[in-house]
Amino acid sequence: MAEGERQPPPDSSEETPPTTQNFIIPKKEIHTVPDMGKWKRSQAYADYIGFILTLNEGVKGKKLTFDYKVSEAIEKLVALLDTLDRWIDETPPVDQPSRFGNKAYRTWYAKLDQEAENLVATVVPTHLAAAVPEVAVYLKEAVGNSTRIDYGTGHEAAFAAFLCCLCKIGVLRVDDQVAIVFKVFDRYLEVMRKLQKTYRMEPAGSQGVWGLDDFQFLPFIWGSSQLIDHPHLEPRHFVDEKAVSENHKDYMFLQCILFITEMKTGPFAEHSNQLWNISAVPSWSKVNQGLIRMYKAECLEKFPVIQHFKFGSLLPIHPVTSG
């Protein structure tokens, strides 16, 4: 990752947005493959990738169990995710002939669709209430598709966009960086894994054994950053069951590996070929750089993923403004 590609934290200059800001309901803007150029030149893309890289830097070399600041906004976001988790318990899967895509997910999703703005309003202070409808759209986009009952990296990106928007309106601040990943995103992953297991959700746009993972990407990026300069855990260790079982509570990357091995059968090299290849990379910093490049190429620059991304006033489609 070239230093020049780093963006400043999106919250650095916009901790308190102007009261005159016109919030809008985000909508799709990428309708055809040629529109992808608009996305890559957009303020939204610059702010989104800047946010991902800022957090990547923030968690470098730190364990999940590291002692970090937890603000009231972080606690409220965790409570929001706890609510989504509770709704899963209240919405058990239904008996149906098809093994995958349990229709009870639609009941769960309908509740979120109805309550999303109320949930976001518990996190956003009243003087920023005008931002709630815009920000809530990203939360609704972050948990899968209720028609197809699937989940993939586009939904994960919507959750990162949701957090990025909360930074841009000043709800989350620069010193929340570690907690955004270790507390909020980690809890989000737990809830998404529970959704995937409970309702047997299909992977959206999965590349099968040639993809990195059926459902997630960001925890591999941030998780590899956590492991940079680790005194003894090297990339080759993540395919070692003992190393994973002993260290997964400290490292997001190893939690992802544990989940894959719980969900899939057979040799690791066969069901997760891409990850198996990554285990041969000599250092975590090289893994981290490679995953950032791969994320851009396989997720952010792929029309089937980005066609669903929504743009509003906080993540706008207009070209990057300098300064």
From Swiss-Prot:
Q: Does the keyword 4Fe-4S apply?
A: no
Protein localization: Cytoplasm; Nucleus
Gene Ontology CC annotation, any one: ATPase complex
User: Which named protein is this?
Assistant: Serine/threonine-protein phosphatase 2A activator
The gene designation is: Ptpa
Question: Key word Cytoplasm present in the record?
Answer: yes
Gene Ontology molecular function, alphabetical: ATP binding; metal ion binding; peptidyl-prolyl cis-trans isomerase activity; phosphoprotein phosphatase activity; protein homodimerization activity; protein phosphatase 2A binding; protein phosphatase regulator activity; protein tyrosine phosphatase activator activity
The record's annotation in PANTHER family points to:
SERINE/THREONINE-PROTEIN PHOSPHATASE 2A REGULATORY SUBUNIT B, SERINE_THREONINE-PROTEIN PHOSPHATASE 2A ACTIVATOR
The UniProt subunit note reads as follows:
Associates with PP2A heterodimeric core enzyme PP2A(D), composed of a 36 kDa catalytic subunit (subunit C) and a 65 kDa constant regulatory subunit (PR65 or subunit A). Interacts with the catalytic subunit PPP2CA (via C-terminus). Interacts with PPP2CB.
Task: Give the source species.
Answer: Mus musculus (Mouse)
Q: Which EC class, in a word?
A: isomerase
Question: Which keywords describe this protein according to UniProt?
Answer: Acetylation, ATP-binding, Cytoplasm, Isomerase, Magnesium, Metal-binding, Nucleotide-binding, Nucleus, Rotamase
Report the catalytic activity: [protein]-peptidylproline (omega=180) = [protein]-peptidylproline (omega=0)
Q: Which residues bind Mg(2+)?
A: G208, D214
Annotated ATP binding sites: R148, T153, G154, P304, Q307, H308
